[in-house]
Structures are given as C-alpha cells and as structure tokens.
Amino acid sequence: MLTRKQLDLLRFIQQRMRETGVPPSFDEMKDALDLKSKSGIHRLITALEERGFLRRLPNRARAIEVIRIPEAVASGPAEVVRFTPSVVEGGRSSAPVKPAPLPTALVSDESGHAVSIPVMGRIAAGTPISAIQSQSRSVAMSPDFLAGGEHYALEVRGDSMIEAGILDGDLVVIRRQDTANTGDIVVALIDDEEATLKRLRRRGSSIALEAANPAYETRVLGPDRVRIQGRLVSLIRKY
C-alpha cells in the first residue's frame, strides 16, 4: 500500500506527463507536494521505484518513467494539486492553415480501457525529415496517460531532444492540434515538406524551433513557413 504522499506524487507526475509529455522537475515536485527540500522527493521516488511504480533512467535529465498506476490513481477522482505551472500563451500564426488529415485515435477521458494509437512513421529529433506517412501499425495505451482529443504516434529518429528525455527509437504520442503554447514540444511541419520534433518558442513575429541538445542550433522561421501538426503528450520506450 502506498502512503498519501506517494500517491500524491504519482498523481502529479502522471498529470504533468499527460499535459506536457515530459516528467516534472524535482523543484516542481517539491512545490507540488509542499515539501521543504528535494531530499523528500528523492525518498518518495525511491519508495515508488522499490514498489515497481516508477523507473529512473541514469544520466538523463528528468528521466522518470511511470511503469504502472495503482487503482487509487487510475480509477479514483483526480485531486487538485497546489502547484500551478507558469505557461506563456502563444498566439496563432497570421495565416493558419488546416493540417493534413491523419488517422488518429479519439480518446475519452472517462474510458478505462486501453485505446489503439496509430503509428504514423518516423519523426526527426535532429535534421528534419519527411514524416506523417501512412499508418504502419498501432500501439495500445491507457487513456490515463492521454488528454482528451485525437492522437497519433511517431518513432523518433535522432538525438536532438535527449536533454528532454526523448531518445532515438522512442515512440512519441502526439495530440493532434494546430496551435501550441511557447515551451510545448511539438511536431512542426516546415515548408509543407519536412517534419521535426522540437520545442516551440515565440520570438516576436517569428517561430523558433529549439533542440534539447547543445549540438543543434535553434531554427528561427517565419510563421508562414511552420505548421503545427500536434503537441507531445506522452512517450513510450521499449527495453
């Protein structure tokens, strides 16, 4: 049986993974649980690891994976967490274009059953490559890790997002949408030809596509050259 604090931490990590696709930082977890130091978070994570609910990946920033969810978290009512993330709202491009239709899975937040997410080829976490291809296969996911809406998955190729915990060979689960907030990790279609997985930043009237690896430069483009194809909401890794 988990303690109240352990359950609260697991809920918070699950919530942030659902909202942003990446785990929270230790400072964010400390603030969310109203703890005075990060050592308390380390103890909670160690306890959850020992019980088989979390896994930490060595030498990776924010590399925490939720392995399983206890019934109290998966089926019980969600609790309000005191932490409120600071979000910078991003505006729409001056000439929004409707994204190309894609096979997607519609996820109901009230469903307790696994849903099938179509895998739509590969996405570059490095130099942009062609992506958003035809459906090659599907992957089953618990709706607990997904927000409502339509979703598809892409296989990551490259290492430009490693400091965000996204590795070559991972499957990224994308919520289909054509707008995003500054700081979101998105699938960006450049010049209607190349797709890449990057963090979105707004720089005046321009859009910056930012890597999470210092070996890669940030690309700054006009809004007419970039179309958002979706936002990262979850990640799947096989061992």
Curated annotation (Swiss-Prot):
EC number: 3.4.21.88
InterPro entries referenced in this protein's UniProt entry, alphabetically: LexA, LexA-like, LexA/Signal_pep-like_sf, LexA_DNA-bd_dom, LexA_repressor, Peptidase_S24_LexA, Peptidase_S24_S26A/B/C, WH-like_DNA-bd_sf
Sorted UniProt keywords: Autocatalytic cleavage, DNA damage, DNA repair, DNA replication, DNA-binding, Hydrolase, Repressor, SOS response, Transcription, Transcription regulation
Subunit-structure text: Homodimer.
Record-linked PANTHER family: LEXA REPRESSOR (PTHR33516), LEXA REPRESSOR-RELATED (PTHR33516:SF2)
CDD domains: S24_LexA-like
Species of the source: Methylobacterium sp. (strain 4-46)
Name listed for the protein in its UniProt record: LexA repressor
Reaction(s) catalysed (UniProt annotation): Hydrolysis of Ala-|-Gly bond in repressor LexA
GO molecular function, one term: serine-type endopeptidase activity
Keyword DNA repair: yes
Transmembrane residue ranges: none
Regions recorded as binding DNA: 26-46
Any matching Pfam family: LexA_DNA_bind
Superkingdom: Bacteria
Family, as annotated: Belongs to the peptidase S24 family.
GO biological process, one term: negative regulation of DNA-templated transcription
Gene name for this UniProt entry: lexA
Cleavage (site feature) positions: A125, G126
SUPFAM superfamilies in alphabetical order: LexA/Signal peptidase, Winged helix' DNA-binding domain
Role noted for this protein: Represses a number of genes involved in the response to DNA damage (SOS response), including recA and lexA. In the presence of single-stranded DNA, RecA interacts with LexA causing an autocatalytic cleavage which disrupts the DNA-binding part of LexA, leading to derepression of the SOS regulon and eventually DNA repair.
